[in-house]
Amino acid sequence: ECTSIMSDVNWSTTRAYGLGINGLYLNLRGRERDGIVEHGAERENLLNELVTRLTAVKDVDGQSVIRGVYRADKIYAGDATALAPDLIIGYRRGYRASWQTCLGNLTPEVLLDNDSVWSADHCADALEVPGLLCCNQIIRADNPSLIDLAPSILEDFGLQKPQAMTGRSIFTA
């Protein structure tokens, strides 16, 4: 038997909800079973409000907790975008969603110290985490990007990149 982690949520008044480590979803009419947020102006206003309020969150020392909040419809493309959270939270280095939050629970505190031995994860804003790619081939592309990895791997295995996939091979100029 399965128990819903959000069984106590009053969906008739919930405009947005978090699921996972850094995704926020709007309770959209037509997409969610009990959606209340209308597409159009109401959706846009709520997205803007959430971005503004989240980027204003500070810790007890007055430091910003969130570097950026990104709209899926602005950073993703393709058919799978509909499956993505409406907003992706990019935490500053040293901050993340709590373990309880990731599981759909609420804690009395807004911010908690991480007293776990786990000290690294993928909640951080991509601009906070430098990347490094080690490979045994010459990278011929100028200014390669993360979105270029999947097409590069496919090419290396002799497979065609799907038409809807963004990015390009880093191994060809």
Question: How should these model regions be labeled?
Answer:
Residues 1-104, 152:
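Secreted, luminal/periplasmic, and some membrane-associated catalytic domains
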Residues 6-38, 113-157:
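Substrate-binding rim/cap in mid-to-C-terminal beta-strand-loop elements of soluble/periplasmic
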Residues 26, 71, 135, 172-173:
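Generic structural "secondary-structure junction" signal
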Residues 56, 155-162:
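Short, well-ordered loop/turn and helix-capping segments at boundaries between secondary-structure elements
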Residues 100-118:
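Short, surface-exposed loop/helix-turn segments at secondary-structure junctions
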Residues 102, 133, 137, 170:
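Adenosyl-5′-phosphate
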Residues 141, 162-163:
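Short, surface-exposed helix-loop/turn micro-motifs enriched in polar/charged residues
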Residues 163-173:
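Cytosolic regulatory/linker segments at or just downstream of nucleotide-handling modules
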